[in-house]
Amino acid sequence: MLYKGDTLYLDWLEDGIAELVFDAPGSVNKLDTATVASLGEAIGVLEQQSDLKGLLLRSNKAAFIVGADITEFLSLFLVPEEQLSQWLHFANSVFNRLEDLPVPTIAAVNGYALGGGCECVLATDYRLATPDLRIGLPETKLGIMPGFGGSVRMPRMLGADSALEIIAAGKDVGADQALKIGLVDGVVKAEKLIEGAMAILRQAINGDLDWKAKRQPKLEPLKLSKIEATMSFTIAKGMVAQTAGKHYPAPITAVKTIEAAARFGREEALNLENKSFVPLAHTNEARALVGIFLNDQYVKGKAKKLTKDVETPKQAAVLGAGIMGGGIAYQSAWKGVPVVMKDINDKSLTLGMTEAAKLLNKQLERGKIDGLKLAGVISTIHPTLDYAGFDRVDVVVEAVVENPKVKKAVLAETEQKVRQDTVLASNTSTIPISELANALERPENFCGMHFFNPVHRMPLVEIIRGEKSSDETIAKVVAWASKMGKTPIVVNDCPGFFVNRVLFPYFAGFSQLLRDGADFRKIDKVMEKQFGWPMGPAYLLDVVGIDTAHHAQAVMAAGFPQRMQKDYRDAIDALFDANRFGQKNGLGFWRYKEDSKGKPKKEEDAAVEDLLAEVSQPKRDFSEEEIIARMMIPMVNEVVRCLEEGIIATPAEADMALVYGLGFPPFHGGAFRWLDTLGSAKYLDMAQQYQHLGPLYEVPEGLRNKARHNEPYYPPVEPARPVGDLKTA
């Protein structure tokens, strides 16, 4: 054994060839600060071996290296800029020394090689991969850019265009694509990986392959003419500005850095990467996006823990076809759980099957599946007008109209047709689960399962625990949601549960702004362009359906009369009374017409002004700051109340529910992350300016207490140890 660290070791293989093996404790290899330091020590040992002829890098895990250790990021990013820059220089010196070894090097790459894992293998001369490879640089999705030389080596290896596509979008690619663009040199079956890598290494040692020529371009300026460079970078900057926008600085910074570094050799180019990385690491956007990644891991880990002792449902049923029922049936069947879809009329069943078929055909058009797979999936959805096959189902989700009487009747009837241990769930969006449970003989086998529309796109499923829902019931439904590829978050029962309960105060803030003379177009523009929501409140209401919102508003007002009961007629009432229900009937805040792709396109409609004039004061202008404050304070206050009341268990789950269920701007990280970034004391000062607007603007007591000491909701993070202790030499 030449060297043994905690996460990697170095040993001789044969006749002057050494192997460096990543083998961390636990299930995956990560390139954390300790591993980077250990890698440096191992390379130091290699540099002393006069008889070294070649080096093989490999992993003892199912994945090569999944990336840097993101759990270290928040503390690492709190380190002062100069120290962080110093540590990056040290880390890059390690990869440079790997690249500069006086012998050929090859990485045998299996499974994932992402972020730092990808940057590590870019420093070797050759890369041989297995068919399950996923390789790429996802850093821009975390609000940063590659920091271990990825923005320097990848463009020089692949050419600017292919590298920019991966780096700016934070993409990873599979084995075939990686081979096509030159990111790997070959793809072999897993059992042939080491043998194949050794064969390439021997050829390089024997002089049959010119490894020095392979290495050289990575050390030099980018080979691009002035015209080529102008074309590549101008197009890339235009594309990034369009897709990422101003709220995500990392992608455009990465492109500009690669452009600036194009005329330099490796050392100067790495210095530019360092100078760009460090300020990005200190942005609120990076903290928020890293926070989302960590929260996502936490939520998924919690679901895994919850379901470890239950069997995932093998057969499901959906009550109520239509668009929602068809979407749920498709998602279940697509992920391998056959489903019976029941309705009381053929027309709805046809609609449900058409929806499922439409979604499968889209997969076919995109080349994700072939005709055989399509036929196989659709054959596992069984439409029916009766209860045939219900004695075999493990879980049933009811997705009929949002009416408690209808839902109770359907659930009670279904309970008589299924096994004693079958779990029933209701896809209600507002009706309390404990109320629906009153109609059942086995309320312990019942819970809520709130999908979001469109089902195939929206990652969140709210799992609602009723007063009598058993732990096993919740676990089974969480297991089914996870199997469907969704992110399940368990919440306690109340009107609107979590997501809708916090959404309607936001809509109430919108209604009050309109009442006070604000222009709905300006509100939408500010909430989209400045705050970053995917849709402003007016457009969102049109998409949700004015009739749906009108009904839900009444349910919420009955549930929380002290805050959500209005004492005035608002814009939602006015549009509802005028039969303007939004996109579904082509008339809402806007008029809708289908574009060439059959998608609804909004147009101005003068008739809306007259309707809104009836429920509004004369038009007046509001500042962007006031619009954001008046829209967000009611939502944030309600989010905090939900945490204080135990409706949602943690700030992490609340923020993920908002991001995945409502499209809360990821660069803010969710309501609690936004609140922590702003500071609870500053938030309280802002909210108190608007408390005259009513109970929705009254800050909950728990938040007031935090504001006294400006306490955050997330546990405070300490900066990483001084970077000198992280090994900078």
From Swiss-Prot:
UniProt catalytic activity: a (3S)-3-hydroxyacyl-CoA + NAD(+) = a 3-oxoacyl-CoA + NADH + H(+); a (3S)-3-hydroxyacyl-CoA = a (2E)-enoyl-CoA + H2O; a 4-saturated-(3S)-3-hydroxyacyl-CoA = a (3E)-enoyl-CoA + H2O; (3S)-3-hydroxybutanoyl-CoA = (3R)-3-hydroxybutanoyl-CoA
Alphabetical keyword list: Fatty acid metabolism, Isomerase, Lipid degradation, Lipid metabolism, Lyase, Multifunctional enzyme, NAD, Oxidoreductase
Residues that coordinate or bind NAD(+): 324, 343, 400-402, 407, 429, 453
Site residues, Important for catalytic activity: 119, 139
Region of interest: 3-hydroxyacyl-CoA dehydrogenase: 311-729
NAD is among the record's keywords: yes
Chain sites annotated for binding substrate: 296, 500, 660
Recorded metabolic or biological pathway in which this protein acts: Lipid metabolism; fatty acid beta-oxidation
Region (Enoyl-CoA hydratase/isomerase): 1-189
InterPro entries: 3-OHacyl-CoA_DH_CS, 3-OHacyl-CoA_DH_NAD-bd, 3HC_DH_C, 6-PGluconate_DH-like_C_sf, ClpP/crotonase-like_dom_sf, Enoyl-CoA_hyd/isom_CS, Enoyl-CoA_hydra/iso, FA_oxidation_alpha_subunit
SUPFAM superfamilies, sorted: 6-phosphogluconate dehydrogenase C-terminal domain-like, ClpP/crotonase, NAD(P)-binding Rossmann-fold domains
UniProt GO MF annotations: 3-hydroxybutyryl-CoA epimerase activity; delta(3)-delta(2)-enoyl-CoA isomerase activity; enoyl-CoA hydratase activity; long-chain-3-hydroxyacyl-CoA dehydrogenase activity; NAD+ binding
Oligomeric form and interacting partners: Heterotetramer of two alpha chains (FadB) and two beta chains (FadA).
Family affiliation: In the N-terminal section; belongs to the enoyl-CoA hydratase/isomerase family.
Record protein name field: Fatty acid oxidation complex subunit alpha
Gene source species: Escherichia coli O9:H4 (strain HS)
